[in-house]
Amino acid sequence: MMPPPFMPPPGIPPPFPPMGLPPMSQRPPAIPPMPPGILPPMLPPMGAPPPLTQIPGMVPPMMPGMLMPAVPVTAATAPGADTASSAVAGTGPPRALWSEHVAPDGRIYYYNADDKQSVWEKPSVLKSKAELLLSQCPWKEYKSDTGKPYYYNNQSKESRWTRPKDLDDLEVLVKQEAAGKQQQQLPQTLQPQPPQPQPDPPPVPPGPTPVPTGLLEPEPGGSEDCDVLEATQPLEQGFLQQLEEGPSSSGQHQPQQEEEESKPEPERSGLSWSNREKAKQAFKELLRDKAVPSNASWEQAMKMVVTDPRYSALPKLSEKKQAFNAYKAQREKEEKEEARLRAKEAKQTLQHFLEQHERMTSTTRYRRAEQTFGELEVWAVVPERDRKEVYDDVLFFLAKKEKEQAKQLRRRNIQALKSILDGMSSVNFQTTWSQAQQYLMDNPSFAQDHQLQNMDKEDALICFEEHIRALEREEEEERERARLRERRQQRKNREAFQTFLDELHETGQLHSMSTWMELYPAVSTDVRFANMLGQPGSTPLDLFKFYVEELKARFHDEKKIIKDILKDRGFCVEVNTAFEDFAHVISFDKRAAALDAGNIKLTFNSLLEKAEAREREREKEEARRMRRREAAFRSMLRQAVPALELGTAWEEVRERFVCDSAFEQITLESERIRLFREFLQVLEQTECQHLHTKGRKHGRKGKKHHHKRSHSPSGSESEEEELPPPSLRPPKRRRRNPSESGSEPSSSLDSVESGGAALGGRGSPSSHLLGADHGLRKAKKPKKKTKKRRHKSNSPESETDPEEKAGKESDEKEQEQDKDRELQQAELPNRSPGFGIKKEKTGWDTSESELSEGELERRRRTLLQQLDDHQ
């Protein structure tokens, strides 16, 4: 069973372009599979025996008188053995190992009858010497995806597009060998061929060339075939002799063949052909050689070919006419193709002529072109219809060409104008278009360039605009660089002035307590201060303030350091401590080198204030202890048994109190005498007050005073109240006019009246004083808090010690009490004396219901003063 010859051999060469990579093994592309039920040509059906030519000892049947074609015989022999092949009539040809076949797509493949394999590549046993050398060459040809051939070297792994010289030399050898074979086979073309066409034999492998030496026996009764056989026997013998002589004798027979062809035709009249097809082909060649046209009649053709010996190739007239008609049909097709090619060539010639002619443009009319080129042969040879098509194509080509040329010219002009503008120093970012035009006309490069002068105005304006924008960008960049330089210089000036302030601080001229007015004379003489003047941003004064604020911000940290130094040194700041001693103690410590002088001074002031506060607190405590001692001494005098009298002398009673602790606590004798005298004065005042109280009681026994109810809004008292005694009443004063007393509200009188009644009828003056003092304290509490907060906000320290806070609070209380006393003393002379009571027939005048607490306090103090005066 034969393998399907239409299947491709394994392996397909990659169509990679040369990139330095070795390609895969080369193989032809796969053959498309055949439809089912269809076998490739020249192959038997599946299961059928192979052709007779492939069966050893079998010869295909031939017509009588036919010459058996040469059959290639190739046998695989052992190494060193010679391969011999000869075919003799009557002896069967040897079995062929390789046979050549044609695939459905026209490609040739080879089949091995022994191992039943088919390959695309020609076996080495069938190759000639040149083909073997070509197959052994390391360079192989491949094709890329685009179909372009490239070459790859299997040994050096190199790929290239150009064809190597080795391949060219080998192909020249192959062509020379093929030409030698054609010269060897040339005598065979002179002999008649068998009537049945046979496929061309495959290429002869290296070794002896097979020679056809046998003929088939003619059939009985075939006289014509016998004549042909007898005529071809001399030619066959000559051809065999030529093959036996080898390639060296082929060159000697070629001149003889040329001489035979150059002989007159009557000498070739004895030629005959082996089959009818060859004879018919010879008759057609005769008609072609005589250039018989396709529209010639049989009679015209006979006149042209009847004298040629090949006219008798077909013995029958019907066969001649049949061959003539076939020739006419074929010739007609050829003439049409020739006419089409001539017309195509004429159109191409006309198109090329019009495209290259200088008078042709894309705007030229067809009539104008016809008038210009109508007399030329290149124009007239093309038909009108084809000429217009060609003309339209030419116009399209010229329009495209002119457009491309215009683009190139525009690009060139723009580039030239840019170069000229770049080289003109007189053009800046403020130059106008009219000025630039004048500058361009004065420029020699622009004046000598005619194409540049014919440049489109819009393109020139666009080019100029781009140039101006580029100059503006450069100018803006230059300005930005200048601004950056200026800012950098200003920053350097500020840094230099900051360094100058650091120098002043290091020398001690600048500290946290420095002021600009004090430091200005030293600062204004420095050049770094002068460089700062006039520049935007922070001024020298701002930098000075910032510097001082930074020093002040370091106060608390430096204060802690100073306290640590004093603690380590065992030094304490007292009220009488001098700053020089304080600074002298601190200067011995290394930590004092980084301290600010102003902060040192502030710390000293703070510590000094604390010392003063402690001293004041100590004095206050001493005063409180003294007051307690004095109170104890007075209590001792008051509790003396028997009680002391007004006329008693201190020397008389001193011995009675010597052993008492209160007596011993008062160390000074003068203080004891003073306290004793004060006690006697109080005792005297008490006695006087007691006498006045008794007199008032006896004077009111027989009298009844009826008081009408008060008409004031606050009249919640009883209908009848006792008036104060005459000794406690204020002195009567002249009644004022309403105009004189308009500034004083009448409601105050009612409040004062109620206060006076309370003094006379409900209790002692001391109880009312205590109540007034209590109300006054309540009213003054918010003010004290406000003052405290204000005082805290003004203090240099945000955080103080508890002892310092207590001392400050006590100081503030004393200061507030002193201020109240001074205010009361200042208001006493300006106040209206007495109650200022307006009496009516019905009772006290209470026109106003409210008085301020301050007014009530002042009036209360006035009443107390008057009471003291009466006593």
UniProtKB/Swiss-Prot annotation:
Domain FF per the UniProt entry, residue ranges: 276-330, 340-397, 410-470, 490-550, 554-610, 625-682
Sorted UniProt keywords: Acetylation, Isopeptide bond, mRNA processing, mRNA splicing, Nucleus, Phosphoprotein, Repeat, Ubl conjugation
Bias-annotated ranges (Basic residues): 691-711, 777-793
UniProt feature, compositional bias: Pro residues: 192-211
Cross-link type Glycyl lysine isopeptide (Lys-Gly) (interchain with G-Cter in SUMO2), residue numbers: 175, 838
Region (Disordered): 171-277, 690-871
Domain WW: from-to ranges: 92-125, 133-166
Residues modified as N6-acetyllysine: 148
Tissue specificity statement from the Swiss-Prot or TrEMBL entry: Expressed in the striatum and cortex of the brain (at protein level). Highly expressed in testis, fetal kidney and fetal brain. Moderately expressed in pancreas, skeletal muscle, placenta, brain and heart. Weakly expressed in colon, ileum, ovary, prostate, spleen, kidney and fetal lung.
Subcellular localization, as worded in the UniProt entry: Nucleus speckle
Amino acid composition bias (Low complexity), ranges on this chain: 182-191, 212-221, 245-255, 739-756
Entries under Pfam families matching the protein: FF, FF_PRPF40A, WW
Compositionally biased spans, kind Basic and acidic residues: 803-824
GO terms for cellular component: nuclear speck; U1 snRNP; U2-type prespliceosome
GO molecular function annotations of the record: RNA binding
Top-rank taxon: Eukaryota
Task of the protein: May be involved in pre-mRNA splicing.
Subunit record text: Interacts with the N-terminus of HD.
Membership in a protein family: Belongs to the PRPF40 family.
Name listed for the protein in its UniProt record: Pre-mRNA-processing factor 40 homolog B
Species name: Homo sapiens
